[in-house]
Structures are given as structure tokens and as C-alpha cells.
């Protein structure tokens, strides 16, 4: 604290006229010494300060330039992504339309296939019915023929006596015998 008070005391005290030198006490220096010190600092510090400011300015400009490049790249990526999105949306629409048309085509194919299958089943059914009708008709004919034959045999048996029956058999045997002689 004593140095600080001493320096204020020295402000009011001027050195004697015969001495020349630098006063290192900043608070006790005169304006000439201060201007010399500031001049030396400005002269030598100007280059260093300019270099520091130029370096800082270059870094700021580089950062701005890099930021602009990154911004441009981001904008380009965004445009590319939007273009890809539009392309994918277009392809999705095409797939959707193609899918709907494919579904309609498959639906028509299924309807046609089902119609053909039903037609074949109808034909099989008709053929089966016709076959069953023919079989039934044949069975009825066979029964009618058997009943007619049994009726004829019954009528013949009731009308013919044993003697008439033997004569008919002999006559038929005779006819077969003459037929055999003619064919030989």
C-alpha cells in the first residue's frame, strides 16, 4: 500500500532538470514517457494485432464459407430427397393402379374359370341324368319283357296240354332237322 501512496506523492513532484531516464512507475510517469511506450506498443504490437485479427477474420470467413457449403449441400440433399419421394410416390401410384387392374383381371379370370367349371358340372349332371334315364328305361324294358315272357309262358302252359306240348316240340324238332339238311 505504501507504493501506491508514494506514487501519488510523486505525481506532484517533478524530477530535477539535470536527470534523464525512464520512470518505470506507471502512475508517476509523465505524458512523454507514456506516449513513447504507447508508440512502441502500437508500432510493434500493430503487426501482431493485425495478424491476430486477420487470422480471426480468416477463420470467421472460412466458417461462413463452410457453413454456406454445408447449407448448399443440405439444400441439394433435400432436393434429391424430394425428387426421390416424388419418384417413389409415382411408382406407388403405378403399383396401386397396376394392382387394381391386376385384381380386376384376376377377378375376371376367376369368374370365367368358375363359369367354365359350372358349365362342365352342368354337362356332367346332364350326362349323368341321361345315363340314369337310359339305365332306368333299359331296366323297365327288361322287366316288361320278362313279365311278357312269363305271361306268354304262363298262357302257353295253361293252353297247352302235355300231348299238345309234345307235338309242338316234335314239330319244332322236325323243322330244325329239315333246316339242317338244307344247310348241309
UniProtKB/Swiss-Prot annotation:
Topology class, membrane:
Single-pass membrane protein
For this protein, the record's InterPro entries field holds:
ATP_synth_b/b'su_bac/chlpt
**Superkingdom of source:** Eukaryota
Q: Does the keyword Transport apply?
A: yes
Query: Which Pfam families does this one have?
Result: ATP-synt_B
Instruction: Could you list this entry's UniProt keywords, alphabetically sorted.
Output: ATP synthesis, CF(0), Chloroplast, Hydrogen ion transport, Ion transport, Membrane, Plastid, Thylakoid, Transmembrane, Transmembrane helix, Transport
Membrane-crossing residues? 27-49
GO terms assigned for molecular function: proton-transporting ATP synthase activity, rotational mechanism
* Compartment annotation: Plastid, Chloroplast thylakoid membrane
Record-level GO cellular component terms: chloroplast thylakoid membrane; proton-transporting ATP synthase complex
The extra comment attached to this record reads:
In plastids the F-type ATPase is also known as CF(1)CF(0).
Q: What family does the entry list?
A: Belongs to the ATPase B chain family.
Oligomer and partners:
F-type ATPases have 2 components, F(1) - the catalytic core - and F(0) - the membrane proton channel. F(1) has five subunits: alpha(3), beta(3), gamma(1), delta(1), epsilon(1). F(0) has four main subunits: a(1), b(1), b'(1) and c(10-14). The alpha and beta chains form an alternating ring which encloses part of the gamma chain. F(1) is attached to F(0) by a central stalk formed by the gamma and epsilon chains, while a peripheral stalk is formed by the delta, b and b' chains.
HAMAP family hit by this protein: ATP_synth_b_bprime
Q: What does this protein do?
A: F(1)F(0) ATP synthase produces ATP from ADP in the presence of a proton or sodium gradient. F-type ATPases consist of two structural domains, F(1) containing the extramembraneous catalytic core and F(0) containing the membrane proton channel, linked together by a central stalk and a peripheral stalk. During catalysis, ATP synthesis in the catalytic domain of F(1) is coupled via a rotary mechanism of the central stalk subunits to proton translocation. Component of the F(0) channel, it forms part of the peripheral stalk, linking F(1) to F(0).
The name on file for this protein is ATP synthase subunit b, chloroplastic
Q: Which organism is it from?
A: Crucihimalaya wallichii
